[in-house]
């Protein structure tokens, strides 16, 4: 749990925002951009507001600051999108605003959106880790909007039998991952070509799980895995 409480750390800057993966994003934000001219009495608000809307996706990823992959479930993406569109639609229902009001409200909605996305991603990971053993759930990658998944290991086992089964499942998962990773590398090459080596699953690279990192994966035993997890 301590690991989950400090997930807000670092993310790639060269990425897009999660909300742009929603099916209505283009339509909604096209409307918002084209109607920004009618929202303020002061002409200076127009370019500022337009820039906020244009850079919305890229700025979102820059502000997420997540140490875990920015992957969100479709259900939670729908919830976030619905909340953001409601706030934006309500803002656009008003007539012209006094100078400075409209861009400030856009910034407030933007910050609330970032907060909602952070919570959605972290809540899914916490729910996953409240299970017993290996669990995977389907997600959308905020980087490129492709279908993806997240794997985690949950410690919420109610009996020694469940715990043993969970550890065995983890061992099988790691061994299968290692075999697949090895098969992706060129046999005749002394080094890895770009794209031929996969990153270690995120839930295996926390500081508390050093014993599950390469090069230990290939020869990991059930006893070793159990001991490592007990230390965690």
UniProtKB/Swiss-Prot annotation:
InterPro entries: IZUMO, Izumo_fusion. Keywords: Glycoprotein, Secreted, Signal. Pfam families: IZUMO. GO terms for cellular component: extracellular region; nucleus. Glycans are attached at residues 24, 219. Disulfide bonds: none annotated. It comes from the Eukaryota. Residues 1-15 form the signal peptide. The keyword Secreted applies. It is found in: Secreted. Its main location: secreted. Detected in sperm. The keyword tRNA processing does not apply. Belongs to the Izumo family. Izumo is the name of a Japanese shrine to marriage. This is Izumo sperm-egg fusion protein 4. It comes from Homo sapiens. The lineage of its organism: Eukaryota, Metazoa, Chordata, Craniata, Vertebrata.
